[in-house]
Amino acid sequence: MDIKRFGNRQGKTIMLLHGNLMCWRQFENLIPLLEKKFCVYAVSFDSFDGTAETTYTTAQAQADKLAEYIEKELDGRLDLLYAESLGCGPTIFLKASPNIQIGRMILSGPEYLDFGVLNRLILKVMPQKQYRTAHEKYMPAWALRFMGQTEQGMQTMLRRI
């Protein structure tokens, strides 16, 4: 995991968590707009940190690493946590952590996904699947693997939301 700090150290703290197949550079056009007023932390998760030495295992593992960093470097407090797609999993676990205080959270879904001619079909099917997942608190094994999540981790997350 790699965490870059930018901006005003006296300002409110903002942490940015990237989406899948991205790294902290996903926010490189946003950071200059924020850094004069805020202290900005841009994160690259394991497997996305450019070292080829780490592996993204679960959202919980990433949240644990972030919690350790936030406790040590920021006294356990963030003013704002922004998460894009993949970053939303660790964000939920951070919010549930008793040692981390987060003033505000913004969770942004996979808005950049475009399935072309399949968009209409996916929009007819996916909302029902998402409702079923939230209602039954069940996620298929293939989806858990795709998200880098375990059944236990998903059940914990679903109980807390």
Residue ranges and their predicted role:
Residues 6-52:
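Conserved HGGG/HGGXW glycine-rich cap/lid loop of the alpha/beta-hydrolase fold
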Residues 20, 44, 64, 110-119, ...:
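Membrane-interface segments of envelope glycosyltransferases acting on lipid-linked substrates or membrane lipids
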Residues 41-80:
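Active-site loop/oxyanion-hole signature of alpha/beta-hydrolase fold enzymes
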Residues 96, 102-133:
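Flexible "cap/lid" loop of the alpha/beta hydrolase fold
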